[in-house]
Amino acid sequence: MSMQDTFSSPEHFTVLLREAVGGLALKENGIYIDGTFGRGGHSRFILSQLSKKGQLIAIDRDPQAIQVAQNIQDPRFRIVHDSFSAIPDICEKLGLTGKIDGILLDLGVSSPQLDNAERGFSFMKDGPLDMRMDTTQGLSATEWLRQVSEQDLAWVLKTFGEERFAKRIAQAIVGYNKSAVQSGAEPLNRTLQLAELIAQSVPFKDKYKHPATRSFQAIRIFINSELDELEKVLNGALNVLAPQGRLSIISFHSLEDRMVKHFIRKQSKGDDLPKGLPLREEQIQHNQKLKPVGKAIMPTEQEMAANVRSRSAVLRIAERI
C-alpha cells in the first residue's frame, strides 16, 4: 500500500503528500498548522511523525471537513472551524504567536467538494448552484448571480478566471436572469443549467477543456474570497512562524501560484531600501524575512496518472529567517 493510500480517504486522494509534509522539515516535538484539513490526509501524516509532545492545529471552513476531523481522537490534535486567514488570531488566542514550526496549505477545492453535486462546485454534475466553502454563511452563487451587474460579473470572470469571453458570458447570464424575473420563471439555480448557458455563449470550444471551467473557477474564487484569504494568511504567517519555521503551500491555478511565488520572492529580498544608504551586508540580510527552499515541485507522472486532478498542482516551500 502506498503512502497516498494510507493517508488518503476513500473519497479524496491527497496531492503531493510526501513532498508537502516533507517540506515542513518536521520536528517531532514541533507545533504545526494544517490550514486546509479537507479529509485529513496531510494532518494524519503529520501526526504520524510527531512525538507525544508535538501539536497539530487543523483548520477548515467546510462543515463537512469539520465533521471528519472530529473523528480524530488524539490529544495532540485540535480542529478549528474557520478560514485559514484566521491563523494569526487563532495563534494569538492560544499563545502560539511566533512559536509555529510549520504551516501547510492545500489550496482550492477538494475532491469530495467537487464530487458532491449538492455543493455546486462541479459543472459536470447537476446540483444547486451554491459554491460556498462554508455553507453556513455568505451568499451562494445563485444569490450572487441574481444581483450582480453585467459589468461586475464580466470583471470577475476576467480577473479570477482569465476568461477571454467574459463579456459574452456575463451578458448571457445577466440577460437570462433578467428575462426569468420578468416572465415569472426561476433564475439560474442549477450547475448544469449555468454550464450549458456558458457553453452556448462561447464561440470557440477548447477540445481539452470544458467551456465552463474558467467561469466556474472565477465565480467560486469570488464567492469564497479565496485570493483575499490567501493574501491575509501569507502576510500573517510571518508573525506566526518561529525562526526556521516552514511554509508549505500547494496551489492549483496560476493566480494562486503567482501570489505565493511573488510573496516568497519579495520576502526573501526584504523591504525595499533607498539606494545609497550606508548599510552593511548583515543589515540588508537582517531585513529578509523568508528564504525559498528549493524550486517549485510538481506531481510525478505516476501521481498524475493515479489522480488526474493533481496535474495542475504546484508546491512551493519557504523558511522563516
From Swiss-Prot:
Enzyme Commission number(s): 2.1.1.199
Pfam family membership, one: Methyltransf_5
GO CC terms of this entry: cytoplasm
Signal sequence segment: none
NCBIfam families, sorted: 16S rRNA (cytosine(1402)-N(4))-methyltransferase RsmH (TIGR00006)
Family per similarity comment: Belongs to the methyltransferase superfamily. RsmH family.
Record's protein name: Ribosomal RNA small subunit methyltransferase H
Organism listed in the record: Histophilus somni (strain 2336) (Haemophilus somnus)
Gene: rsmH
